Amino acid sequence: MQDNEIFEKVQDIVAEQLGIEKTIVTREANFSSDLGADSLDTVELVMAIEEKFAIEIPDEDAEKITNLSEVVDFIKSKLNTISV
């Protein structure tokens, strides 16, 4: 799966979960300060991403992820591990 494809899927999830326009969900947008996500929103985002990509994001990793770019990198690393 390509970087852009992952980004677009995550962008859709974030926009839908937070009820915001897809255009403001950029790679560098911070979930809390830029997109207005609270801690419950973040948990729901992680769960939706885990379900969409059939991966598990451990809590300690989820706490470090603050924007879409970091999510995309994490998903790519997980998918590469699975396919190897």
UniProtKB/Swiss-Prot annotation:
One of its GO terms (molecular function) is acyl carrier activity. It holds the Pfam family PP-binding. InterPro entries: ACP, ACP-like_sf, PP-bd_ACP, Ppantetheine_attach_site. The modification O-(pantetheine 4'-phosphoryl)serine is found at residue 39. Keywords: Chloroplast, Fatty acid biosynthesis, Fatty acid metabolism, Lipid biosynthesis, Lipid metabolism, Phosphopantetheine, Phosphoprotein, Plastid. 4'-phosphopantetheine is transferred from CoA to a specific serine of apo-ACP by AcpS. This modification is essential for activity because fatty acids are bound in thioester linkage to the sulfhydryl of the prosthetic group. One of its GO terms (biological process) is lipid A biosynthetic process. GO terms for cellular component: chloroplast; cytosol; membrane. Its main location: plastid. Pathway: Lipid metabolism; fatty acid biosynthesis. It is found in: Plastid, Chloroplast. Belongs to the acyl carrier protein (ACP) family. Carrier of the growing fatty acid chain in fatty acid biosynthesis. HAMAP family: Acyl_carrier. This is Acyl carrier protein. It comes from Porphyra purpurea (Red seaweed). The gene is acpP.
